[in-house]
């Protein structure tokens, strides 16, 4: 309708140069409320409260084959080893031993990614004898690392627990803004010696 105001969830400072019509108001990120982790998944809430958590969530549409998942597992292993060497009682102001929640969406191995079929009832490597377990065995067995195909609460709710000290994501606007808003001490150096390229995004 003529003269009607339109709010857009963006900022001119991060957009491509353009003329913004007078009836359009960039208002920045719109943060939607979400049910708490305690409401949606009390068991996960209790697990998160054990200690500072790295949350790996690469979005709904980013799938990994086994080689990529093993590469990420190796990064996780190095981060946990570095944390153990520090022997600190807290990370980013959160007390406890560093742990990892990793939402992993899997595909069948296909070099050309011609067919992105999601695994159904088949797991590659989180069980003993698999390649991921070979990298993260003790951490998986002790539940220090959780690898899941879906997290029931909204990602923003996981971040709002205050237990997440590092958010590894696919670079989407919601994930980026959620991490900046809810992660207390957003670490920019935790993975400084590790470079992982997943789907064009470098962590």
Please tell me what each predicted stretch does.
Residues 2-4, 96-98, 184-185:
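A short helix->loop->beta-strand "cap" motif at the edges of active sites that frequently abuts
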Residues 16-135:
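Conserved catalytic-core segment of nucleotide-activated headgroup transferases in glycan assembly
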Residues 7-9, 27, 148:
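Hydrophobic residues at beta-strand termini and immediately following loops
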Residues 2, 50, 160-163:
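Alpha-helix C-terminal capping/helix-to-coil transition sites in glycosyltransferase folds
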Residues 141-151:
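Active-site donor-binding acidic/aromatic loop of nucleotide-activated sugar
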Residues 1-23, 195-200:
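Active-site-proximal region of nucleotide-activated glycan assembly enzymes
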Residues 151-202:
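A donor-sugar binding/catalytic signature common to diverse glycosyltransferases
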């Amino acid at each position: 309708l003529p003269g009607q105001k339109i709010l857009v969830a963006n900022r001119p400072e991060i957009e491509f140069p353009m003329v913004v019509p007078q009836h359009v108001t960039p208002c920045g990120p719109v943060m939607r409320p979400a049910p708490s982790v305690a409401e949606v998944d009390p068991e996960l809430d209790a697990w998160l409260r054990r200690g500072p958590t790295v949350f790996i969530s690469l979005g709904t549409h980013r799938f990994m084959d086994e080689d990529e998942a093993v590469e990420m597992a190796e990064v996780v292993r190095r981060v946990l080893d570095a944390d153990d060497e520090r022997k600190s009682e807290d990370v980013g102001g959160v007390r406890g031993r560093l742990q990892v929640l990793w939402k992993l969406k899997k595909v069948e191995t296909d070099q050309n990614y011609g067919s992105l079929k999601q695994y159904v009832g088949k797991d590659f490597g989180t069980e003993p004898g698999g390649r991921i377990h070979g990298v993260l065995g003790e951490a998986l067995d002790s539940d220090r690392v959780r690898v899941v195909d879906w997290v029931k609460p909204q990602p923003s709710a996981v971040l709002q627990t205050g237990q997440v000290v590092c958010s590894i994501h696919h670079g989407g606007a919601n994930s980026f803004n959620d991490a900046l808003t809810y992660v207390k001490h957003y670490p920019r150096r935790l993975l400084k010696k590790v470079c992982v390229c997943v789907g064009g995004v470098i962590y």
